[in-house]
């Protein structure tokens, strides 16, 4: 499906930008990518990996047929050709068909999802929503060799330090026996499995949900949901709060008050004139909130809480965070 490929590419880019050092974009034309020198680079990298403790069998198997992938560099250098409006994005990412499937998938996997939800304090509808948006409920995890993709990006050089570390992390995961090198597939950017974790995220946050001694984000749903829930819990999820809600603003609303960095008690927003979409009062809750206005300030407007900011640790896109919350609410029947 063409749009899913577009969304996957965008998601992969978001994974990089969320976890990698900033890389300045310029109008200068980048030099044409060449594979010349890759073999020498790989020999040097393998020596470095061995010196850092990666076993010889892992290095031999992981790099048995490694070649640079020009398509990865093409994706990495590409810029979006068009910009979706918020409404277009939400319709494509949270269509009724995905809501229906989300409800069915949650029901089908309820025992596994709810076990992770209970242990880590992240409600099951959110775990299901992340799963649905990231990988289409596990169907679209990416078909690139993670080792080859990361080696290509590290060799290309623009963010060599970051991708060298991620490649080393990927080898560490293989060396620990979590996944065979040939089965470590993911996005062109190196995001892996049904949770789309980068190798560093895997090492820091992934969990063995089925207690079998290894972490399989590709095939073991217990591990997938435990890992996603642990990540969200660790970076700040509050179990007793929702993510946010759509609201209406007074006509004289000061746009200087808009933005994720401006947080006020809900009661203060009520005094300013912020209301529910039906004109009713805001909920009486002792919570801080921010106002986010999409479509470059044209609306609609959302009141967002702590968990919205937590979602944005996963992906820095405001649209993505609203989509996750919207899908989660729909799955739960809100």
Where are the regions a protein language model picked out?
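Bacterial N-terminal signal peptides that target proteins for export
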Residues: 1-9
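C-terminal segment of classical bacterial N-terminal signal peptides
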Residues: 15-23
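An acidic, Gly/Ser/Thr/Pro-rich helix-cap/linker signature
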Residues: 25-108, 114-117
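Short, functionally critical alpha-helical segments immediately adjacent to catalytic or ligand/cofactor-binding
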Residues: 49, 58-70, 123-138, 170-175, ...
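Secretory-pathway/luminal and periplasmic proteins that interact with or process carbohydrate-rich
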Residues: 68-75, 135-144, 156-160, 176-182, ...
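Substrate-binding/active-site groove segments that recognize
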Residues: 145-154, 167, 192-207, 228
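Acidic, glycine-anchored loop motifs typical of Ca2+
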Residues: 209-217
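C-terminal soluble interaction/assembly domains
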Residues: 247-334
């Amino acid at each position: 499906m063409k749009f899913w490929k577009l969304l996957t590419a965008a998601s992969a880019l978001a994974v990089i930008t969320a976890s990698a050092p900033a890389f300045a974009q310029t109008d200068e034309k980048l030099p044409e990518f060449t594979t010349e020198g890759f073999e020498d680079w790989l020999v040097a990298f393998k020596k470095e990996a061995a010196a850092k403790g990666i076993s010889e069998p892992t290095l031999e198997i992981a790099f048995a047929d490694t070649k640079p992938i020009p398509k990865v560099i093409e994706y990495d250098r590409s810029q979006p050709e068009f910009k979706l409006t918020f409404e277009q994005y939400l319709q494509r990412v949270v269509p009724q068909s995905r809501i229906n499937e989300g409800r069915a998938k949650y029901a089908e996997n309820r025992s596994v999802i709810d076990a992770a939800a209970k242990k880590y304090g992240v409600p099951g509808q959110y775990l299901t929503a992340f799963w649905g948006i990231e990988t289409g409920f596990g169907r679209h995890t990416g078909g690139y060799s993670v080792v080859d993709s990361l080696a290509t990006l590290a060799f290309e050089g623009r963010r060599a330090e970051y991708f060298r570390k991620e490649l080393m992390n990927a080898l560490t995961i293989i060396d620990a026996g979590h996944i065979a090198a040939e089965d470590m597939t993911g996005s062109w950017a190196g995001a892996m499995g049904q949770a789309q974790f980068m190798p560093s995220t895997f090492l820091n946050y992934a969990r063995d949900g089925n207690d079998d001694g290894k972490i399989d984000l590709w095939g073991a749903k217990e591990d997938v949901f435990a890992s996603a829930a642990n990540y969200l819990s660790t970076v700040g999820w509050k179990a007793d709060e929702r993510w946010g809600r759509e609201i209406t603003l007074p006509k004289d609303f000061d746009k200087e008050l808009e933005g994720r960095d401006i947080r006020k008690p809900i009661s203060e927003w009520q005094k300013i004139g912020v209301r529910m979409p039906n004109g009713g009062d805001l909920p009486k809750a002792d919570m801080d909130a921010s106002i986010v206005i999409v479509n470059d300030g044209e609306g609609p407007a959302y009141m967002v809480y702590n968990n919205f900011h937590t979602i944005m640790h996963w992906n820095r896109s405001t649209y993505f965070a609203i989509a996750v919350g919207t899908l989660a609410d729909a799955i739960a029947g809100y």
